[in-house]
Design a protein with these regions (language model features):
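Helix-loop-helix hairpin linking two adjacent transmembrane segments in secondary transporters
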Residues: 115-120, 124-168
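Structural signature of the two symmetry-related core transmembrane helices
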Residues: 62-76, 248-263
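Helix-to-loop junctions at the C-terminal end of transmembrane segments
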Residues: 48-59, 236-247, 330
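Conserved MFS/SLC helix-loop-helix module at the cytosolic interface between two early adjacent transmembrane helices
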Residues: 46-83
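A late C-terminal transmembrane helix in Major Facilitator Superfamily
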Residues: 298-335, 342
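Paired small-residue
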Residues: 70, 74, 85-94, 271-279
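Cytoplasmic helix-loop-helix junction between adjacent transmembrane helices
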Residues: 90-129
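Helix-breaking motifs and short loop linkers at transmembrane-helix boundaries and internal kinks
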Residues: 28, 59, 80-86, 114, ...
Length: 361
């Protein structure tokens, strides 16, 4: 049930990506429509530290179950609302739920496993999270082709997972239940920053790419399928991650993300756009579990919920900031050129990060 819960996290905001062009026609195409997707990420970023505190003090399982129920209710509510402000409100509540799910899942895995097994299962966590995108995004694209509101019903899956969590989850270790004061590991701040920047770049896929693909002649079903391509290779990256030397994985993964994004912007072929997404998604699949593992090693058991929640906050703050940071570029140079410039900068940054690690070691 823990890994099943992970499938609901990354796709939570992106599942309405195929609906964005139709939503733009209903509400007016602009930043606010894109925020219907990313305001969920802001709510996750804000709520994650609180969720970490709750996980450390009250337990991982109660937080997970309550968050799953809230996820199902707030997610499906989007089908029924008729105004953009109310829709943004339901998406905000959804974000609170995802913050609790991600934090409790990461804390449970790091409580249950040590050493190589921990790295392996953190890779599984990222793989299952990405797998949720592979399964749900194409389905959302098909549903959006019928009615842009239908994808909101996919959030109801969380109700089934909640029942399984209630019945199937074992008690967590006692060390995880009793939080004690301690110094916060300052090295975690740099990890949070890397996660924010990488995710800000990666989230151009669901927020900007649907409009680029529409201009290339793609419909909602194709948009959902193509965007899901990035999550497909994220699964591969996360599964390969435990078998690679960990030192330079983060820098190499970020460089791959940048290379993929540069390819997206440099072509007018949907096939090559898909290839760029596959490369970038593989890079992200390497980065996230490695950052998770480093944080788990830094944090004592009683503080894991809080320390790991900072990574959740960094990831989803990057998602929220993505359309805002890219917005000035799009009218100035166009969506395609925005991908090129972002990709070049990201590739250089990842290479510097990887080479810098090599020099220190």
């Amino acid at each position: 049930m823990v890994l099943a819960s992970a499938t609901l996290t990354i796709m939570a905001a992106a599942i309405i990506a195929p609906s964005l062009p139709a939503m733009g026609e209903v509400y007016g195409e602009g930043v606010l429509v894109r925020l219907a997707l990313t305001i969920t990420s802001l709510a996750i970023a804000i709520s994650a530290p609180v969720a970490g505190l709750v996980a450390d003090r009250l337990g991982r399982k109660p937080l997970l179950v309550v968050s799953l129920v809230l996820y199902a209710l707030s997610g499906t509510a989007g089908f029924f609302v008729s105004s953009l402000p109310v829709l943004l409100g339901t998406r905000t509540v959804l974000g609170l739920a995802v913050g609790g799910i991600m934090t409790s899942v990461s804390a449970l895995i790091t409580d249950w496993f040590d050493g190589p097994e921990r790295g392996r299962f953190l890779g599984f966590q990222q793989a299952f999270a990405s797998l949720g995108g592979v399964v749900f995004l194409p389905l959302a694209g098909v549903l959006a082709g019928v009615d842009w509101r239908l994808p909101f019903w996919l959030y109801a899956v969380a109700a089934v997972v909640a029942l399984g969590a209630i019945a199937g989850l074992t008690n967590e270790p006692r060390s995880a239940q009793k939080a004690v004061p301690g110094a916060f590991p300052r090295a975690a701040i740099g990890i949070y920053l890397i996660a924010l920047i990488a995710t800000l770049t990666f989230y151009m896929a669901p927020t900007q790419l649907p409009f680029l693909l529409r201009d290339l002649g793609a419909g909602p079903a194709v948009i959902g399928l193509v965007v899901a391509g990035s999550t497909l290779t994220s699964v591969a990256g996360a599964l390969v991650f435990p078998k690679l030397p960990q030192g330079r994985i983060t820098g190499a993964g970020i460089a791959l993300l940048g290379a993929g994004w540069a390819l997206i912007g440099a072509t007018d072929s949907i096939w090559l756009v898909t290839a760029g997404l596959l490369v970038g998604g593989f890079g992200v699949g390497l980065v996230v579990p490695n950052l998770n593992l480093r944080l788990a090693d830094l944090a004592p058991p009683a503080q894991r919920g809080r320390v790991l929640s900072g990574l959740v906050a960094g990831i989803f703050l990057g998602q929220f900031l993505s359309p805002l940071a890219i917005a000035p570029l799009v009218p100035a140079v166009g969506i395609a050129a925005a991908f090129v410039w972002t990709g070049v900068v990201t590739t250089v940054g990842g290479a510097i990060l990887a080479l810098g690690y090599k020099e220190k070691n």
